[in-house]
Amino acid sequence: TIINVKCTSPKQCSKPCKELYGSSAGAKCMNGKCKCYNN
């Protein structure tokens, strides 16, 4: 799921993804936006 959070690295996406989808959520930075996924 791509969320409306700007990023330059996956580390910036980890916290918002975990807040939205729970502590097991993964995070990537794609095209300047965060992408969250459940493993």
Curated annotation (Swiss-Prot):
Keywords annotated in UniProt: Amidation, Calcium-activated potassium channel impairing toxin, Disulfide bond, Ion channel impairing toxin, Neurotoxin, Potassium channel impairing toxin, Secreted, Toxin, Voltage-gated potassium channel impairing toxin
GO molecular function, one term: ion channel inhibitor activity
One Pfam family of this chain: Toxin_2
Main location (coarse class): secreted
Location of the region described as Interaction with Ca(2+)-activated K(+) channels in the Swiss-Prot/TrEMBL record: 26-34
Residue numbers of Asparagine amide PTMs: N39
Site note Aromatic residue of the functional dyad, residues: Y37
Domain of life (superkingdom): Eukaryota
Disulphide bridges, residue numbers: C7-C29, C13-C34, C17-C36
GO cellular component term of the entry, any: extracellular region
Sites marked Basic residue of the functional dyad: K28
Tissue specificity: Expressed by the venom gland.
Localization annotation: Secreted
Family stated for the protein in its record: Belongs to the short scorpion toxin superfamily. Potassium channel inhibitor family. Alpha-KTx 02 subfamily.
Domain writeup: Has the structural arrangement of an alpha-helix connected to a beta-sheet by disulfide bonds (CSalpha/beta).
Job description of the protein: Blocks voltage-gated potassium channels (mKv1.1/KCNA1 (Kd>25 nM), rKv1.2/KCNA2 (Kd=2 nM), mKv1.3/KCNA3 (Kd=1 nM), hKv1.5/KCNA5 (Kd>25 nM) and mKv3.1/KCNC1 (Kd>25 nM)) and calcium-activated potassium channels (KCa1.1/KCNMA1 and KCa3.1/KCNN4, Kd>25 nM).
Name of protein: Potassium channel toxin alpha-KTx 2.1
